[in-house]
């Protein structure tokens, strides 16, 4: 995210960053220069993404994609709406699959094109995790999550205007 933002800024573009901060990936001012934070008008909203066993298993009944849905936050959604009401954007880049629950909000409040920057195909990672475990129940559950993620990932490509895949392999898989 930082290198892309810096490149866009150096090319004379106006950049606004609104970011999710989690327990695993907390936002810390010290990791960014004051200049970068000022130029990007950086905002960070904490979202609780810790695995909740009850929510994880209830997603089996509701068929929600738990891996993705735990990144949705009404606080972040409200902050996003506020930004979209105040400013117009040409492009809104979603920095991972886990930001896609906000596509509906973006579409309702902006005419901007939405680009998904895909770091990897998440379902492949979960498939590998499933294959690596010897616990049969866990393997079944992880395979279920991998299947759900695959359906979600390939469904979401129809909801965005473009995909910026990090690797050629992922770009080819998305194109298939």
Where are these regions (language model features)?
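N-terminal subdomain of nucleotide-sugar transferases
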Residues: 1-43, 85-87
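Short active-site oxyanion
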Residues: 14-15, 88-92, 158-163
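Short N-terminal targeting/anchoring amphipathic segment
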Residues: 80-101, 113-115
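A short, active-site helix/loop in glycosyltransferases that binds the activated sugar's phosphate group
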Residues: 101-102, 150-176
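A short helix->loop->beta-strand "cap" motif at the edges of active sites that frequently abuts
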Residues: 13, 109-113
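Acceptor-binding helix/loop patch of EC 2.4 sugar-transfer enzymes
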Residues: 55-66, 114-151
């Amino acid at each position: 995210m930082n290198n892309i933002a810096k490149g866009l800024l150096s090319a004379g573009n106006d950049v606004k960053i609104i970011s999710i901060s989690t327990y695993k990936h907390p936002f810390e001012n010290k990791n960014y220069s004051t200049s970068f934070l000022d130029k990007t008008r950086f905002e960070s909203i904490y979202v609780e993404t810790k695995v909740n066993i009850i929510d994880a298993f209830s997603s089996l009944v509701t068929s929600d994609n738990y891996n993705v849905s735990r990144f949705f936050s009404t606080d972040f959604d409200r902050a996003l709406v506020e930004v979209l009401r105040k400013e117009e954007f040409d492009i809104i880049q979603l920095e991972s699959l886990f930001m896609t629950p906000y596509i509906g909000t973006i579409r309702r409040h902006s005419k901007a094109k939405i680009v998904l920057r895909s770091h990897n195909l998440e379902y492949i990672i979960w498939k590998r995790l499933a294959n690596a475990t010897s616990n049969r129940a866990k393997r079944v559950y992880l395979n279920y999550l991998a299947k759900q993620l695959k359906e979600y990932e390939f469904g979401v490509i129809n909801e965005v205007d473009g995909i910026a895949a990090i690797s050629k392999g992922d770009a080819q898989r998305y194109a298939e």
